[in-house]
Amino acid sequence: MNSPASDETAPRRNRRKVSRKNYDENAMDELIEKQLGGKAKKKYRTKQDLEKETETEALIALSVGFPIDELLEEEIRAGVVRELGGKEQNDYIVVRNHIVARWRGNVGIWLLKDQIRETVSSDFEHLISAAYDFLLFNGYINFGVSPLFAPYIPEEGTEGSVIVVGAGLAGLAAARQLLSFGFKVLVLEGRSRPGGRVYTQKMGGKDRFAAVELGGSVITGLHANPLGVLARQLSIPLHKVRDNCPLYNSEGVLVDKVADSNVEFGFNKLLDKVTEVREMMEGAAKKISLGEVLETLRVLYGVAKDSEERKLFDWHLANLEYANAGCLSNLSAAYWDQDDPYEMGGDHCFLAGGNWRLINALAEGLPIIYGKSVDTIKYGDGGVEVISGSQIFQADMILCTVPLGVLKKRSIKFEPELPRRKQAAIDRLGFGLLNKVAMLFPSVFWGDELDTFGCLNESSINRGEFFLFYAYHTVSGGPALVALVAGEAAQRFECTEPSVLLHRVLKKLRGIYGPKGVVVPDPIQTVCTRWGSDPLSYGSYSHVRVGSSGVDYDILAESVSNRLFFAGEATTRQHPATMHGAYLSGLREASKILHVANYLRSNLKKPVQRYSGVNINVLEDMFKRPDIAIGKLSFVFNPLTDDPKSFGLVRVCFDNFEEDPTNRLQLYTILSREQANKIKELDENSNESKLSCLMNTLGLKLMGANSVLDTGGALISVIANARRGRSRSHVVAGQCNLPLNPLHFN
């Protein structure tokens, strides 16, 4: 049997394997060094040398996701060359591949543009800049957690401020990248730890200790996988998940290899037939589930007719449900495997010591506030505002990385509401469930030679219960075993007592090993997951549900109003339901935020719309009870702070109110408490002297209601909320480095 890929990405189907070399990062280092002549330096090279070097670098670029002789769509959109398809494009590709190969040769160093100039002719200077900038700002080079990157990270942010909601892989990747771009960043995380759905549980004590993955576990394919790069930077060994995966029937007997092979062959043939059927059905296939089509074809072609074969067939169905974190009755027959062409090649690996080592390295040094579940996200042309409990956080932009399950539950209120197109995509996509029972035992009773083994179940409805076991003893530091629960069984798992679940899984293990004379002891410690009822996830990972398609992943990735951005595994059409997909989405959004910030900076003189969080009614209500009223001047401030530097508003009424109440002109401006006190302390009692101080001495400019809403909408929102008695405190993204000025993003 082929081993499943991971609890996040088991193979979408069981394929016949093609023999190929495993991708070895260290071997690739040696190859690059050999081809490039060691450290970068100018040296005489023959035409044959250059051709061989170019070919080698093209293969390296191919291994990390670049086409050998074409541009990526992102490169075309970025305008890296003036004309497509000509000599300039070919030259650009050679330069691009060279830069990629140089950095992949040593991912622990920050590759400088000047280093590229040492090995590329000055005739291609414009291509060096185009390729280097594209690769740098799109997260293809100089990304990750290398300690040697520190000198190249700006100490103070100058590009703007960003709030990142969620400290999972997507949020951490984006935050680190944004800091390297020069942004001020603040990460808000609802849990007490980083990682999100990547969670390494430390089990046991002094004598028996193990690190077990309760969430995402396997690095699925090293080719082009950024998590493999992080492991290299941290010098963490990777353990290849071995292919051997024996299956045991419900009586604990090893399944006959011939029968196993025959059923697997029939299963794969049916999946091939599904592809043929949906092509014939065209649009009608969008309305039918994969489970419905598979069962119809199984009966039609007489696959798995007897009870023993049916149990084997059900095991493969459970494995498919595991791969998609969803019941086959929910998966789209038309698009369930739409990401197959983008699967990363190479070995599937465990990370020695657990994935927490990657998570901790990514989180190190980031400004993260834990225990901050977000209630409301407000966004508009003036900036963004995040409400978490009794606190308000403000910034220029916000990146939301919460799981799709949280978005489906409407746990976060968006003001204004998300576009209907995006909300519809959220509703259409599926978000399924995978649960686990993690057990630490006194010894490795299952043997050292296995990383996985499977178990058949008696009934189809229960096919996903403890159907697969992962052995972590090779990488966890102790004799740990994890049982997986998929499909309908994963849903029932949520409401079953842990003691009952443990009894069932031990019964299954003792049924396998007892007849062999192997004693299965009680575990030292057991943990049962509950991802479906976790209010910070409401499930495990996404899939394409009936009525949905890969386009919905793209819609989820769309930004809103150049202020609100989205990342996470459910926002990547090519790599959904994977750890590396989440990480790559964070890099993608960091790049997008940088481009938008540059665009906004270059268009500051263009008129902007009013900050969406407040309106004229809010403004008028505030001045019904001003903090200070002096003649025609009224002042309002945030009651939660007495800081002289804190900002408020002043309203000046120009009217003939006594004669005609409708004849009133009201103008506004923003000022500090300190400035208001100067006006208040004037000896003269006339309105004219105070107005002169306001405009001439202090140099403040009066404006109409619409203009002050445009300019100070975020400030007005903060003051209004505080004056309503909501007792919220105000924090600006990157507060340690930012002035406490709510208008810093204007």
UniProtKB/Swiss-Prot annotation:
Record region (Disordered): 1-26
Top-level taxon in the UniProt lineage: Eukaryota
Cofactor: FAD
Gene3D superfamilies, per the entry: 3.90.660.10, FAD/NAD(P)-binding domain (3.50.50.60), Winged helix-like DNA-binding domain superfamily/Winged helix DNA-binding domain (1.10.10.10)
Record flagged with keyword Flavoprotein: yes
Domain SWIRM: 51-152
Residues involved in FAD binding: E189, R191, R197, E569
Database matches in Pfam families: Amino_oxidase, SWIRM
Enzyme Commission (EC) number: 1.-.-.-
Keyword list, A-Z: Chromatin regulator, FAD, Flavoprotein, Oxidoreductase, Repressor, Transcription, Transcription regulation
Cross-referenced SUPFAM superfamilies: FAD-linked reductases, C-terminal domain, FAD/NAD(P)-binding domain, Homeodomain-like
MF annotations from Gene Ontology: oxidoreductase activity
Class of enzymatic activity (EC top level): oxidoreductase
Tissue: Expressed in the shoot and root apical regions of young seedlings. Expressed in inflorescences.
PROSITE patterns registered for this protein in UniProt: SWIRM
GO biological process entries: chromatin organization
Family, per entry: Belongs to the flavin monoamine oxidase family.
Function: Probable histone demethylase that reduces the levels of histone H3 'Lys-4' methylation in chromatin of the floral repressor FLOWERING LOCUS C (FLC) and the sporophytically silenced floral repressor FWA. Seems to act in partial redundancy with FLOWERING LOCUS D (FLD) to repress FLC expression. Required for cytosine methylation of FWA. Controls primary seed dormancy by regulating DOG1 and abscisic acid signaling-related genes.
Record-linked PANTHER family: FLAVIN MONOAMINE OXIDASE, LYSINE-SPECIFIC HISTONE DEMETHYLASE 1 HOMOLOG 2
Record-given protein name: Lysine-specific histone demethylase 1 homolog 2
Organism, scientific name: Arabidopsis thaliana
Gene: LDL2
